[in-house]
Each structure stands twice: as structure tokens, then as C-alpha cells.
Amino acid sequence: MSKRPSYAPPPTPAPATQMPSTPGFVGYNPYSHLAYNNYRLGGNPGTNSRVTASSGITIPKPPKPPDKPLMPYMRYSRKVWDQVKASNPDLKLWEIGKIIGGMWRDLTDEEKQEYLNEYEAEKIEYNESMKAYHNSPAYLAYINAKSRAEAALEEESRQRQSRMEKGEPYMSIQPAEDPDDYDDGFSMKHTATARFQRNHRLISEILSESVVPDVRSVVTTARMQVLKRQVQSLMVHQRKLEAELLQIEERHQEKKRKFLESTDSFNNELKRLCGLKVEVDMEKIAAEIAQAEEQARKRQEEREKEAAEQAERSQSSMAPEEEQVANKAEEKKDEESIPMETEETHLEDTAESQQNGEEGTSTPEDKESGQEGVDSMEVEGTSDSNTGSESNSATVEEPPTDPVPEDEKKE
């Protein structure tokens, strides 16, 4: 009898009384009801986790896996549970848990970070332990034994189904388990065989030329359709961006062309204006300015001289008029003092004037002398006007003096 490994479950004790002649009984207990005895009535073979029906096939239990790391809140709860329980001995468990939950919510992020760090560290260790657990000989042996048991159960179910079709009895008696044969599935020989097969399988996978694809790199059909749609949308967007870039490039080239054209036109205009520039001779300009000033001075002197001459002529023309006014005043005085004498003198004057008039009309020489005086006055007026227009003076010309009648000249 081989030694049982530590991970193997303890064997089921054999029943005290066997009743092979009674169909349907597996392990008879005289103190139990017949309906609660271990019957095998053709149900699902998986309903019995430990011992199956009449074949005695057992499904082994897996070895104990590593303990999962505690969550940060559970770590904090374990740490402060005794303290809260001691301070509140009369409270119930759920009330204490409520208090601890409020304390956890009141903690700052820095205080919670300590428990989070511990949890993350233990989680990394747990993942490593799970990898070692899945690769351990005990777990591999459990997998092999479980697969064999499931295969045997399937075979038994097929046989039972065939018996039912052939009309064989529905119930069968489960045979008693032999403690000596219980360890055959977990013997050292089976463990060594499983380890040997595992090692050779790993070596063949490592040394094989085929590359094992990563599960994350496997692309499903739905994912492929989504990726195709994304590629199409990206291509459309790329074409749109390329069209926008072409438009921007065209606008830039147009602006650049206009800028260059304006620059060329400006340079040409500047060259033309530089070619048309006149050299300035300051001496010549100074001489022209002096000449213009001299001419302006001469014109000013001429205008002043002409103005003085016009004033003299106006004064000379005004003197006979003043004499006439004075004579008229004296005549009025004489008429007032001697009215009779004035009448006589008036008659004589009228007679003389008539005689003079007859003489003036009869003698052509007097007419010619009068016409010459008028012509001379007109010539003087035209000469004055010509001199005034040539000098461009702003002075107003004096009107030509009226010709003096011959009677007044004689007086």
C-alpha cells in the first residue's frame, strides 16, 4: 500500500453492513430511512461530488490554492475592529461594521494609500503563487485524475443508457469501496508520470518551430469588421485633409505670386522715378530767387509811382471844380445884395453868351480846338489804363475827367 499524499482526501469508510441481495442499496444504515439511502437512480453523474453511483468512480478535490489578498478596507477593519469593539461593547456586529465603514470614509487619501500599497504588494505575490500553483505537480495530477474520472463517468452514462434501451434493470447496487485501491489514482507512479508528460510537453512546445499566438493578438470577425470601418473612415479623413492642404497651398502660392508681382512693380516704379530725378543746383536757384525779388521790387516801385501820378492828376482835376463852386457862391451873394444889378448883368451875359454861341457855331477853328482837347484827354486816359494793366496793380483807375465846357473855360 502506497503512502497517501497530503493533498489527497481521506477515504470514505466502508459501510458496516452490506446487503448485496437487496437491489438499490449502496451503504445500508439500519437507523436511516430507506428513502434517504444512497440510491443510484440514473440521474446526472455530476450531482454527486464525491462518490458516484454503482461504479465507485470518485471526482477528486483540487489542492488548496493560495489565499487571496485582503482588500484595503478589510485590512483596515481587522486593524481597528478590536479597538472599536472595546470602546462599544454593547453594539452589535453590523453596527460596529457601520462605524468602521464611516471611519474608513473619513480617512484621507494618504492614510488609505498605505493599505492600498500593502494590497498591491500581496496581489503581486498572489499572482505569482497562482502561477506556481497551476504548474505544481499536485494540481497537474488533480487535472489528470479529474479528466479520467469525467471520462469514466461519461462511459458509465453511455453504458447505462444502452442498458436502459435494452431493457436491463434501472437500478444498480454500488459496490463497496476498497481502501487499498483508493490511492491508485494518486500514487507516486501516477504523479511521476504526470510530471514527466508535463515536462516533455513543455520542452516540445519550447523547441518547436511553430509560434504560439498570443490570445490578445487574436482578432475576431466582428473586431475585423470594426477595424475595417475605422480604416475606411481614417482614409476618408486623410483624403479630406490632403484636399484641404492642397487648397491652402494654392492660396499660399497665389498670395506669394501677388506679393512678388507687387514687389516687382514697386521696384520698377522706383527705378523709373530715380531715373527722372533732377539735379538741384543751389547757386542757380539762389540766382533765380534774387532775380525774382528784384523784379518784384521794381514792379512795386512802378505801382507806387503810378499811384502818385494818379493822385496828382485827380488833385489837378478837382481844382477847377472847387473854383467853380467858389464862383457860384460869390455870384449868389452878389445876386442877393444887388438883385437889380444881377438882372442887368444877366441880360448882358445872356446876350454875350448868345453872341459867343453864334461865334462858336460859325467858326470851325474853335470846334477843332475843342475836339483836340477832348482827344488829348482820351489819349491820356488810355495811356493811364495801359500803364495800370502792365503793372498789374490793384489800384482803382480814376475815371476820365469830363471835358470842361467852353463857357466855363472863358469864364
From Swiss-Prot:
MF terms (GO), sorted A to Z: DNA binding; N-acetyltransferase activity; nuclear receptor binding; RNA binding
Compartment annotation: Nucleus
Glycyl lysine isopeptide (Lys-Gly) (interchain with G-Cter in SUMO1) crosslink site(s): K92
Pfam families: HMG_box (PF00505)
UniProt entry tagged with the keyword DNA-binding: yes
Modified residues (Phosphoserine): S265
Coiled-coil positions: 222-319
Location of the region described as Disordered in the Swiss-Prot/TrEMBL record: 1-23, 42-70, 153-175, 294-411
GO cellular component, as recorded: bBAF complex; brahma complex; chromatin; kinetochore; nBAF complex; npBAF complex; nuclear matrix; nucleoplasm
InterPro entries for this protein: HMG_box_dom (IPR009071), HMG_box_dom_sf (IPR036910)
Statement: the UniProt record of this protein carries the keyword DNA-binding: yes
Ranges of biased composition (kind: Basic and acidic residues): 153-168, 294-312
GO terms for biological process, alphabetical: chromatin remodeling; negative regulation of DNA-templated transcription; neurogenesis; nucleosome disassembly; positive regulation of cell differentiation; positive regulation of double-strand break repair; positive regulation of myoblast differentiation; positive regulation of stem cell population maintenance
The entry's DNA-binding region: 66-134
Cross-link (Glycyl lysine isopeptide (Lys-Gly) (interchain with G-Cter in SUMO2)): K3, K92, K131, K146, K166, K277
Entry PTM: Ubiquitinated by TRIP12, leading to its degradation by the proteasome. Ubiquitination is prevented upon interaction between TRIP12 and SMARCC1.
Annotated Polar residues bias: 46-57, 352-363, 382-394
Residues that bear Omega-N-methylarginine: R4, R40
SUPFAM superfamilies xref list: HMG-box
Record's keyword terms, sorted: Chromatin regulator, Coiled coil, DNA-binding, Isopeptide bond, Methylation, Neurogenesis, Nucleus, Phosphoprotein, Ubl conjugation
Known function: Involved in transcriptional activation and repression of select genes by chromatin remodeling (alteration of DNA-nucleosome topology). Component of SWI/SNF chromatin remodeling complexes that carry out key enzymatic activities, changing chromatin structure by altering DNA-histone contacts within a nucleosome in an ATP-dependent manner. Belongs to the neural progenitors-specific chromatin remodeling complex (npBAF complex) and the neuron-specific chromatin remodeling complex (nBAF complex).
Domain notes: The HMG domain is essential for CD4 silencing and CD8 activation; mutation of this domain blocks thymus development.
Known partners and oligomeric status: Component of the multiprotein chromatin-remodeling complexes SWI/SNF: SWI/SNF-A (BAF), SWI/SNF-B (PBAF) and related complexes. The canonical complex contains a catalytic subunit (either SMARCA4/BRG1/BAF190A or SMARCA2/BRM/BAF190B), and at least SMARCE1, ACTL6A/BAF53, SMARCC1/BAF155, SMARCC2/BAF170, and SMARCB1/SNF5/BAF47. Other subunits specific to each of the complexes may also be present permitting several possible combinations developmentally and tissue specific.
Name used for this protein in its record: SWI/SNF-related matrix-associated actin-dependent regulator of chromatin subfamily E member 1
